[in-house]
């Protein structure tokens, strides 16, 4: 198997030390976060430019830029993610190694209640509580000892059967069936409410500073979205998320135009309700998006993320996944934590099956970021099976990577 390691891949992405002075830091009127801006570029947009074209030079700058990107992603494709509602309560029970967390959230006279089973490790509870993995629709990856698992019924929060699922689910029972939020945004809302109540439920013995999220396929898209928009998530693990996940819209279109049979934006909006209805207005003109999913993943930085893709399934957009995460990696690099971002792309297994020979890569991220152990997380690899389509970084990335000052 031929692996291409990150040290080779990012030669086209030089790191530039930029001046300490930042005009954005001097602005007293705050951070402008419009939901849409004039834009047109076939290349992957520079995540290190503010909406007005000035450069991001510091971590303080990035905090504003992150807000801008989050607003744009909601404005174009995700719909509005509402803040914590005034009512968020819970009950928790446990019998042996099995617990149940019930969350009630909403407004006076209009709440919804959902429950999640929790499986706890055997052994003595750590002083700060167990690390927790939130698994969309159930667990599809192996986990090391010492991590609790909460099974999240995200489809109850935002239904995802087909286009008839628009506005259906417990989130929409609270916010209205015409709410702009996509199903994936609704899922993020549910994850946030789970974390809200765990923070004030000591009986659950969960370390809320060590919460991870994962999911596969459509749920992998959701896990990535949760990691991007919920900053209390300590580790994000999308598995085979494909189009609308850790791939980029522009690159998937390129694959399709090159003769590969992949899922691109024009098709995905007809399949389900993972994106807002507003996204329909842009899927035939992707170049007007002032971001792509390298920037969606970049919202997670500097928090850790590792994603997995499967080249046996062409429709997952293998070149797009690799290229998109190659373009995302400089965001962690600019913050001085490149080993907080990993990517693994192999084949020879079924969709959502996790090959055991990949366990060391996954466990390294669990060990380092949830269990507090020493581990090497410099992991970025592909088998380069792109079905004849050629990845050329200079075709898509015409920006350089700054070193963001503190």
From Swiss-Prot:
Cell location: Secreted
Chain sites annotated for binding substrate: 221, 263, 271, 315
Record: active site: 217, 351
Motif extent (GXSYXG catalytic site motif): 215-220
GO CC aspect terms: extracellular region
SUPFAM superfamilies according to UniProt: alpha/beta-Hydrolases
InterPro entries named among the record's database cross-references: AB_hydrolase_fold, GCE-like_dom
Listed GO MF terms: carboxylic ester hydrolase activity
GO biological process: lignin catabolic process
Thermal effects: Optimum temperature is 40 degrees Celsius.
Catalytic activity: a 4-O-methyl-alpha-D-glucuronosyl ester derivative + H2O = 4-O-methyl-alpha-D-glucuronate derivative + an alcohol + H(+)
Keywords: Disulfide bond, Glycoprotein, Hydrolase, Lignin degradation, Secreted, Serine esterase, Signal
Cystine connections: 31-64, 216-352, 248-324
Family annotation (Pfam families): GCE_fung
Protein EC: 3.1.1.117
Glycan-carrying positions: 100, 110, 122, 178, 285, 348, 376, 387, 398
Root EC class: hydrolase
pH curve summary: Optimum pH is 6.
Entry similarity comment: Belongs to the carbohydrate esterase 15 (CE15) family.
Record's function text: Glucuronoyl esterase which may play a significant role in biomass degradation, as it is considered to disconnect hemicellulose from lignin through the hydrolysis of the ester bond between 4-O-methyl-D-glucuronic acid residues of glucuronoxylans and aromatic alcohols of lignin.
Name by which UniProt lists this protein: 4-O-methyl-glucuronoyl methylesterase
């Amino acid at each position: 198997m031929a692996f291409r390691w990150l040290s080779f891949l990012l030669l086209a992405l030089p790191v530039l030390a930029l001046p300490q002075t930042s005009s954005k830091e001097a602005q007293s009127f705050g951070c402008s976060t419009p939901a849409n801006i004039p834009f047109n570029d076939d290349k992957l947009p520079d995540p290190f430019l503010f909406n007005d074209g000035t450069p991001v030079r510091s971590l303080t700058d990035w905090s504003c830029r992150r807000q801008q990107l989050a607003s744009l992603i909601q404005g174009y494709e995700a719909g509005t993610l509402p803040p914590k509602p005034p009512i968020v309560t819970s009950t928790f029970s446990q019998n042996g190694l099995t617990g149940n967390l019930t969350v009630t959230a909403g407004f006076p006279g209009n709440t919804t209640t959902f429950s999640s089973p929790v499986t706890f490790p055997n052994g003595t509870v750590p002083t700060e509580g167990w690390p927790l993995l939130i698994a969309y629709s159930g667990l599809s990856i192996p986990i090391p000892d010492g991590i609790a698992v909460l099974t999240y019924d995200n489809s109850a929060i935002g239904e995802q059967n087909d286009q008839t699922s628009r506005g259906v689910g417990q989130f929409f029972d609270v916010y209205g069936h015409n709410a702009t939020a996509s199903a994936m945004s609704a899922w993020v809302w549910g994850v946030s409410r789970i974390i809200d109540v765990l923070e004030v439920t000591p009986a659950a013995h969960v370390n809320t500073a060590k919460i991870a999220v994962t999911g596969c396929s459509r749920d992998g898209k959701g896990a990535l979205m949760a990691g991007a928009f919920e900053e209390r998530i300590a580790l994000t693990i999308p598995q085979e998320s494909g189009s609308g996940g850790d791939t980029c819209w522009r690159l998937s279109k390129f694959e399709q135009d090159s003769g590969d049979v992949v899922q691109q934006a024009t098709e995905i909006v007809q399949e389900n309700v993972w994106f807002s209805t507003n996204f329909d207005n842009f899927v035939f003109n992707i170049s007007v998006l002032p971001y792509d999913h390298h920037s969606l993943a970049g919202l997670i930085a500097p928090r850790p993320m590792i994603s997995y893709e499967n080249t046996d399934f062409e429709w997952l957009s293998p070149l797009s996944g690799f290229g998109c995460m190659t373009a995302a990696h400089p965001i962690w690099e600019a913050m001085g934590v490149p080993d907080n971002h990993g990517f693994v792309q192999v084949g020879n297994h079924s969709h959502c099956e996790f090959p055991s020979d990949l366990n060391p890569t996954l466990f390294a991220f669990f060990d380092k970021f949830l269990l507090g152990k020493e581990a090497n997380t410099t992991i970025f690899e592909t088998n380069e099976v792109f079905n004849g389509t050629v990845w050329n970084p200079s075709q898509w990335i015409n920006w350089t990577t700054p070193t963001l000052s503190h």
